[in-house]
Design a protein with these regions (language model features):
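Active-site metal-coordination/substrate-binding segment of hydrolases
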Residues: 171-240, 246, 258-259, 560-561, ...
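An extended, acidic, His-containing surface patch that forms the Zn2+-binding/catalytic region
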Residues: 368, 372-454, 458-475, 480-591
Length: 591
């Protein structure tokens, strides 16, 4: 029986067959089969040696070398050298690069993801360029790029980070965002900005959306460079926006003013490849709290309310502050509030609500009703539980004074509660490929005597143009205004974007589908998909999304409490993106 004398990696690839220099690229399945056969052969060899020794026969040990496991802890040049042509004769460079990423990439990706997650890049009212966490992350990325010989610059509105590799015009752009969704800390078991690995999962805000994917790209490029690969058709860019969870102004500026790559891949959605995104609609409703002329049967006056943390996220928490009204005592109001909560609990399964009395300096005591829901992206409202719906349902059972905030909550119950698709507003848009419309309430605030409610909608393509859609919005607003006796009106900030649809049959799409299909061992034909989500890819004419979500490996957890990605999932994402980068930019046969 032949003994393996070539070291561990060579042992896995060469004992079962002799590979010629002309060997074509191996598929992931072929690589796995070679590894399986080699492991069996190695185990048989060891058993043969043990039996020989037991029988007392002499075993010739001259020049016998024990296989050594790959060491991923070596300095980069020595680590990459384990996958050299000398140690793996006959294996094409593309496959040796894939083996290198498969063996050592995951550890590097986890480490870099953890470093990125520690920057608490939640955007507030200040622009990203003035957010200390965003600025600090930019400095970190600049140093990371410098030590590896990559270019780095700041673009957009001084809030887009661009890492570059190679010469010539940009050919491949990998697009990510470095800002993350807000965190409701009380909902988390693990600390959101102290990433940790537990039971094969990496936890932390941004590990799925979108710092984990960013790390897969950076490590894939770094390891390609270590293997002696280089861009063949032009520059490879890693483009990192930092306002994806808010305004998009920085990346819009970048897409409008910069020379754009031939191929654009965002990694902020799912597989096999996303070629279409619903249009985004932002709408604001307002109501002045005003004064109340007569009390009637009212016992409580709404004075403040709050729901949500982000314009594109379903509220996980909501609260309503009430003052005793028309001579009623705090105890009477408290009893009424508790009764309303209990009555609502009987009607709404899983309701999480509490009532408490708090002290309001200068204003006496206040009764506060709080509800807890489940956060989800506004593009997938059905995956969450809107805490504002629950709060409005409770308010509907309270003897409230009739002011603007009361009117706003009544409107929520009448036109939104239980309806994710905007049907109660009169919308019926559906598309066979892109699906149905959605309408989600995301942010409620009271400031300077005025209640403001943000609505986030997603619309599929249709035969009707933007003008027709604006008319439908006008009709919905008129209905709301009429039902509230003129108290709820549209505020400033209406925004309507077109759906984004790129070429479903482009070489880029075909390449990415082929990569996904081979790595997932999927038989049959795969088709590109559409999402209601909203990624930076829509800003680029040929932009598509490739990952990171794989439903079979776990739910998409971006924007949710205890956001996580399994290590198996993260490793697979890294291997697929690495192959995409090689095929599209590092090979002379790039499409």
């Amino acid at each position: 029986m032949r003994l393996c004398l070539l070291g561990f990696i060579a042992c896995l690839l060469t004992p079962a067959l002799v590979l010629a220099e002309s060997t074509p690229r191996l598929t992931p399945a072929q690589l796995r089969e070679l590894e399986r056969q080699a492991r069996i052969l190695y185990e048989q060899t060891q058993e043969f040696l043990r039996q020989q020794e037991k029988s007392g026969k002499k075993v010739r040990k001259a020049r016998r070398v024990e296989p050594k496991p790959t060491s991923c802890n070596l300095p980069s040049p020595k680590r990459a050298a384990q996958f050299s042509q000398e140690l793996l004769p006959g294996i094409p460079l593309a496959d040796r690069y894939a083996l290198y990423v498969g063996a050592c990439g995951l550890g590097d990706v986890v480490k870099l993801t953890q470093q990125l997650v520690r920057f608490q890049t939640v955007n507030g009212e200040e622009p990203p360029a003035k957010n200390p966490a965003v600025v600090a992350m930019g400095r970190f990325l600049q140093q990371w790029a410098k030590t590896r010989g990559f270019g780095f610059r700041v673009a957009g509105r001084k809030d887009v980070f661009e890492l570059s590799w190679g010469e010539g015009p940009p050919f491949l752009g990998l697009v990510f965002h470095g800002d993350v969704a807000p965190v409701a800390a009380e909902e988390w078991k693990y600390k959101p900005f102290e990433p940790t690995v537990v039971n094969g999962r990496l936890y932390g805000r941004g590990v799925m959306d979108d710092k984990g994917p960013l790390a897969t790209a950076l490590i894939s490029l770094s390891m390609a460079q270590e293997m002696g690969l280089a861009p063949q058709r032009g520059k490879v860019l890693v483009i990192i926006g930092n306002d994806e969870e808010s305004s998009w102004l920085g990346m819009q500026e970048y897409a409008r003013t910069e020379q754009l790559p031939t191929h654009i891949i965002s990694v902020d959605s799912g597989y096999p490849v996303v070629v279409a995104q619903s249009g985004v609609v932002a709408l604001n409703l307002e109501a002045m709290l005003g004064t109340v002329d007569s009390a009637g049967a009212a016992m409580l006056l709404p004075v403040d309310a709050s729901a949500g943390e982000s314009l594109n996220q379903i509220p996980a928490a909501a609260s309503l502050s009430l003052a005793p009204f028309a001579g009623k005592s705090i105890d009477q109001g408290l009893a009424a509030a508790k009764a309303a909560v209990e009555a609502t609990r009987k009607e709404r399964s899983g309701l999480k609500a509490e009532v408490k009395v708090v002290s309001a300096p200068g204003s006496g005591s206040r009764i506060v009703i709080s509800t807890q829901g489940k956060a989800a992206q506004a593009s997938s409202p059905e995956e969450g539980r809107n805490a504002l719906w629950d709060l409005a349902a409770i308010a509907d059972k309270l003897p409230l004074a009739d002011n603007g905030l009361t009117a706003m909550l009544q409107m929520v119950t009448r036109r939104f509660d239980g309806d994710h698709q905007g049907e109660r507003l009169g919308f019926t848009e559906k598309d066979p490929f892109m699906g149905s419309m959605t309408a989600a309430l995301t942010l409620l605030r009271v400031k300077n005597g005025k209640a403001t409610l943000a609505i986030n909608m997603r619309r599929p393509r249709s035969s009707e143009g933007n003008e027709d859609f604006h008319q439908a919005l006008d009709h919905a607003i008129a209905l709301i205004n009429q039902e509230s006796d003129g108290r709820v009106v549209e505020g400033p900030g209406r925004f309507v974007s077109d759906p984004h649809v790129t070429d479903l049959k482009s070489p880029l799409v075909a390449t990415l589908i082929d990569i996904y299909q081979r790595h997932r061992s999927i038989r049959g034909e795969l088709e590109p998909i559409s999402i209601r989500g909203n990624t930076y890819a829509r800003l680029f004419p040929r932009g598509v999304d490739f990952g990171p979500g794989i439903q079979e490996l776990g739910p998409y957890t971006g924007h949710k409490a205890d956001e996580f990605i399994s290590l198996d999932h993260l490793g697979l994402n890294t291997q697929m993106l690495a192959e995409a980068i090689h095929t599209l930019a590092l090979s002379s046969n790039a499409p």
